[in-house]
């Protein structure tokens, strides 16, 4: 058995090596890929991302039976409306997320929601697999009680594959380690039998979160704003400064008076845009209301 496993491993490694030899990623092809993902999604690919790009896109080539990156690029550019464009974008987007990531934001959100009348609404601009918008909805549920039933979280992402996972609302139990036992019981169902070790979002929580595909570079955003709060965390780091400025400018009319904009720990929106000022740790308000 050990010999068989070792042989299989060698064959697998050999196959990967052969694939790399058959499918070289030239400098010209990498530059074109970088241009296309920037045009379509605003993502800036640094030179050190080349290996990541290769590893992700080579899967698409294998699936399509294409043996040259030039042929793949020709396929993309032959039809600007091809479904392969979405697969291309999905492959090159990065999705790092967790429940209650950057935890200091959520007490601020809770206090803000309690202080405001009416139906509280939030936009999560990069929902990924759902951990952020569900964390927002849980926070509102805990903070507002019965009033949370009228709150809405709008959750968007450019990657359609991660949105499917988000809508399914199924996670590993270990992914919820930042939740309290009460939150676990109140907002999730535990899997049994073949689903042991998994949890699913309860319908009451899922009903407050609306998922939709959205490209921040799109000319129009089909959103029901303005919002009491916008979460745009760890998104701008993938864009260049002109793109960052354009997006932040478009956030201004989408925030209600007194609204909050939440950023990632490595992002400084007040250095990018004069429209926002720093109210707290990576939390921004509108400068015109300062």
From Swiss-Prot:
**InterPro entries in UniProt:** Bact_Chemotaxis_MeTrfase, Chemotaxis_MeTrfase_CheR, CheR_C, CheR_MeTrfase, CheR_N, CheR_N_sf, SAM-dependent_MTases_sf
Q: Which Pfam families does the record associate with it?
A: CheR, CheR_N
Write out the GO biological process terms.
chemotaxis; methylation
EC no. given is 2.1.1.80
Binding site residues for S-adenosyl-L-methionine: 95, 97, 101, 132, 157, 215-216, 233-234
Give the reaction(s) catalysed. Answer: L-glutamyl-[protein] + S-adenosyl-L-methionine = [protein]-L-glutamate 5-O-methyl ester + S-adenosyl-L-homocysteine
Q: Which domain of life is it from?
A: Bacteria
Q: Which residues form a coiled coil?
A: none
Q: Which UniProt keywords apply?
A: Chemotaxis, Methyltransferase, S-adenosyl-L-methionine, Transferase
**A GO molecular-function term, please?**
protein-glutamate O-methyltransferase activity
Keyword field contains S-adenosyl-L-methionine = yes
Indicate the segments forming the CheR-type methyltransferase domain, all copies.
18-289
State the protein's purpose. Answer: Methylation of the membrane-bound methyl-accepting chemotaxis proteins (MCP) to form gamma-glutamyl methyl ester residues in MCP.
- Protein name per its UniProtKB record: Chemotaxis protein methyltransferase
